[in-house]
Amino acid sequence: HLCDRRQRQMCIRDSAHSTNHALNKLGYPTHEIEKYNFMVGNGIDKLFERALPEGEKSKENVLRVRKEFVPYYDVHNADDSRPYSGIPELLAYLQTSGIQIAVASNKYQAATQKLIDHYFPEIHFIAVFGQREGVKVKPDPTVVFDILEIAKVTKEEVLYVGDSGVDMQTAANAGVTAVSYTHLTLPTI
């Protein structure tokens, strides 16, 4: 994940501004940035469904929002996002130590790859998976199983690091050990 606790609100802003842009273009009401904290995490289609007003949450409308969102987000997905503090150094250390590193995101594939290429050009990831056509999004464990196959490792050899409940559920569904970093405060949890 690409945002530290101080920056979480800014990172959500990239998705929030892009979603608000799409909603506005389609004549729907927009949301305050803070509300997006509770809309993100299950892929962009679920984000759009949550952002659309009641009575407008059809598959057709989700696709309409997606059509407006993607070109805008492709340009603006790194406006405010930054890696978590210390993550570039940690990834470099893991790479130097010969540990395989992969990415499993619910962002769509092109955006995931663009962000990884932008922020971590010196890091070799064995796989960078975003939301892919025909593959269920997290918390479905398919993405983890795909990475296990590429890495040729067992579940017992994996440490899944995530920053959301969806990540922890994904790890549990895949049967791998997980560590959580969260931007949420205790009263929110």
Language-model features: locations:
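Single conserved hydrophobic/aromatic residue that forms the stacking wall/gate
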Residues: 1-8, 12, 183-189
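Active-site neighborhood of HAD-like aspartate-dependent phosphohydrolases
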Residues: 6-38
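Helix-loop "lid/cap" segments that line or gate small-molecule binding pockets
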Residues: 22-23, 43-58, 115, 147-148
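Metal-dependent phosphoesterase signature
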Residues: 49-88
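Short glycine/proline-centered loop/turn elements that form peptide/ligand docking sites
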Residues: 88-89, 164-167, 184
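Substrate-recognition element of Asp-dependent hydrolases with the DxDx(T/V) motif
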Residues: 90-116
